[in-house]
UniProtKB/Swiss-Prot annotation:
Chain positions of motif 'HIGH' region: 38-47
Function of the molecule: Catalyzes the attachment of tyrosine to tRNA(Tyr) in a two-step reaction: tyrosine is first activated by ATP to form Tyr-AMP and then transferred to the acceptor end of tRNA(Tyr).
Pfam families the UniProt entry points to: SYY_C-terminal, tRNA-synt_1b
Entry keywords, A to Z: Aminoacyl-tRNA synthetase, ATP-binding, Cytoplasm, Ligase, Nucleotide-binding, Protein biosynthesis, RNA-binding
Protein name: Tyrosine--tRNA ligase
Quaternary assembly: Homodimer.
Broad class of where this protein is predominantly found: cytoplasm
Motif segment ('KMSKS' region): 227-231
Highest taxon of the lineage: Bacteria
Recorded name of the encoding gene: tyrS
Binding site for L-tyrosine: 33, 167, 171
GO BP terms in the entry: tyrosyl-tRNA aminoacylation
Enzyme class: ligase
């Protein structure tokens, strides 16, 4: 079985590690955890490095623990933050915890000998009293030690509340609790979590005299210098209600050539050799972008499932060529309807409207005059066939699966009409 550290290092997924981790892994599988902040009801692609680290841990024989911060989410981690975030209510956090758990179940197995476990740190943090916490945790840390953490130093000028200042102690308590209750010996996280992770290892050492370990992965930026996972429309979410599967697929498909090797290593389970073969294929014919296509297909299938991914791929082919419209299923056209301008009409309305009327209705033309000029220049089409007249009507036999008709202006402007 592959060694966890070797697997992660081979994919450039390790930024830092505590001394002795390699020796501990050589002794056998390990139980490790990653914490997730429940301030939203969905994970986004910025969380996927953490998710993949848990998946690799399980593949290498270890037991992953997913700690959803129902307790720490009420405090707020200052790491990488310029200002204090609003504190969520218990009810909001509990709803978000349930949603995040459902998403994480797509990445790790909750069955078998090393089944993944989900823990909400509210279960133990809400049960500990202030006096007990100060006695059992606070006495092991000096203020100087806490002030030296980067997450605190970066906020000294702008101000940091005692609530956020104490966050590192609360996360340290998480690590100690999991070590005691579940023999968890490894915490993983982004490089901005290093201070919190080492605080936990320090607490375990002081209270129990035991060695536990930490591993961080790199904070990911793109070759253009922007933060990974951010688009003009904001974050790219795993929840299809927040980011549609089509837009999710396109996000990965549009990966810069300079980033694609790294993202294939980070976010797929393809072997390093298979990734090298993909890149060699891409070098021979860059226009086909096989590396980006494999990346988009792999990640979208894992997040949204293979059936949705196939529909998304077919919908993409409709817009960018390479598919027979008549063969497109209603599911594929439903996906497309969520991404391009669409209008719904009744059967009676369809019988009364000309194609020119429909083009105006969906916004592909401002007027019937524009349609006449466009038709003269062969600039409009219906279901892939160039329009000869805007005065014609869409017959029932012209409709695609699901009662759709696809209108097109030029090469890149599309709209759908659906008959109800």
């Amino acid at each position: 079985m592959q060694n966890l550290l070797e697997a992660l290092v081979s994919r450039s997924l390790v930024h830092d590690q505590t001394p002795g981790l390699q020796a501990r892994l050589a002794q056998g599988p390990i139980t490790g955890y990653v914490g997730f902040d429940p301030t939203a009801d969905s994970l986004h692609v910025g969380h996927l490095l953490a998710v993949m680290s848990l998946a690799w841990l399980q593949r290498c024989g270890g037991t992953p623990i997913i700690v959803v911060g129902g307790g720490t989410g009420m405090v707020g981690d200052p790491s990488g933050k310029r200002s204090e975030r609003p504190v969520l209510s218990v009810e909001e956090i509990d709803r978000n915890v349930a949603a995040i758990r459902a998403q994480l179940e797509r990445f790790v197995s909750f069955e078998g000998q090393n089944a993944a476990r989900v823990r909400n740190n509210a279960d133990w943090l809400r049960a500990i009293g202030l006096m007990e916490f100060l006695r059992d945790v606070g006495k092991h840390f000096t203020v100087n030690y806490m002030l030296a953490k980067d997450s605190v130093k970066g906020r000294m000028e702008s101000g940091i509340s005692f609530t956020e200042f104490s966050y590192q102690l609360i996360q340290a308590y998480d690590f100690w609790h999991l070590f005691r209750s579940e023999k968890c010996e490894l915490q993983m996280g982004g490089s901005d979590q290093w201070g919190n992770i080492t605080a936990g290892a320090e607490l375990v050492s002081r209270k129990d005299g035991a060695s536990v370990h930490g591993l961080t992965f790199p904070l990911l930026t793109t070759a253009s210098g922007t933060k990974f996972g951010k688009t003009e429309g904001g974050a790219v979410w795993l929840d299809p209600a927040r980011t549609s599967p089509y837009k999710f697929f396109q996000f990965w498909l549009n990966t810069d050539d300079r980033d694609v090797e790294r993202l294939l290593k980070f976010f797929t389970f393809l072997s390093v050799e298979d990734i090298a073969a993909l890149l060699a294929e891409q070098a021979r014919d860059p226009g086909k972008r096989p590396a980006q296509r494999r990346l988009a297909e792999d990640v979208t299938a894992r997040v949204h499932g293979p059936d949705v991914t196939r529909s998304v791929i077919e919908a993409s082919r409709i817009l960018f060529g390479g598919t027979d419209l008549r063969a497109a299923s209603a599911d594929v056209l439903d996906v497309l309807a969520g991404e391009i301008p669409s209008a719904a009409v009744t059967g009676d309305e369809l019988a009364a409207l000309t194609i020119a009327d429909l083009l105006v209705k969906v916004g592909l033309a401002a007027s019937k005059g524009e349609v006449r000029r466009g038709v003269a220049g062969r600039g409009f089409s219906l279901n892939g066939a160039v329009l000869e007249s805007g005065d014609a009507k869409v017959a029932a036999g012209d409709l695609l699966a699901g009662g759709y008709a696809l209108l097109q202006k030029g090469k890149r402007n599309y709209a759908l009409v659906k008959v109800r």
